[in-house]
Amino acid sequence: MNYLNKIRIENPLTICYTNDVVKNFTANGLLSIGASPAMSEAPEEAEEFYKVAQALLINIGTLTAQNEQDIIAIAQTANEAGLPIVFDPVAVGASTYRKQFCKLLLKSAKVSVIKGNASEILALIDDTATMKGTDSDANLDAVAIAKKAYAIYKTAIVITGKEDVIVQDNKAIVLANGSPLLARVTGAGCLLGGVIAGFLFRETEPDIEALIEAVSVFNIAAEVAAENENCGGPGTFSPLLLDTLYHLNETTYQQRIRIQEVE
């Protein structure tokens, strides 16, 4: 857990432009791993913040016409500052409006990581793809989708699901940790986007090992939380997840990580 240990020592400032539903949970999750979250949204202060920040999360869960230009502006400011961006195109396939905005953002700024479920990433590479919501997934080939997205956007791809797929540096990794309860908590996937950002340390071309550790730390913590005798369902799972992120140690991490490199 080299990256998590570094986070716990250095408390990296992680800027989160995220959706209104998940701000509190995302901030608390980042605090639990040792990062310092800032839920800053004003383009007017971005230049100053981004000089000292370590990464920026952009999550479009509550995209509106009023915040479109702000998102483009902060992404471009992050590029100018050399700040890595984790982009979470929430429900991109649910509407033409979302898809058009995501395409515009990806043309207007360079992101370091695109993170979403298989349907969301498919919607970014296939104009005919649609989805029913943020958790839609129709038995898609996540590895193939991730590889194609990586080839198109030339950026790291993280696809979440029953198994998670990471493609970066022309490598494809499948991770098999996690808990079904993650799908029963609004904002769990959004928090993962923030966690990934917390692991980047101003690396605009992140090492695949940082991405593997970020996703695995989150999902192993979810497993441990779900197995806790005090976990009775989604309501008790959420705080236990935060507690487990806070306490996770190297022994548990190494014993539980399930990882496979694929062709």
Swiss-Prot record:
Pathway noted in the entry: Cofactor biosynthesis; thiamine diphosphate biosynthesis; 4-methyl-5-(2-phosphoethyl)-thiazole from 5-(2-hydroxyethyl)-4-methylthiazole: step 1/1
Keywords, A to Z, come to: ATP-binding, Kinase, Magnesium, Metal-binding, Nucleotide-binding, Thiamine biosynthesis, Transferase
Q: Name one GO biological process term.
A: thiamine biosynthetic process
> Which cofactor(s) does the record list?
Mg(2+)
Q: Where does substrate bind?
A: M39, G187
- Enzyme class, UniProt record, top EC level: transferase
Q: Which family does it belong to?
A: Belongs to the Thz kinase family.
Specify the protein name: Hydroxyethylthiazole kinase
What is the source species? Staphylococcus aureus (strain JH9)
Name of encoding gene: thiM
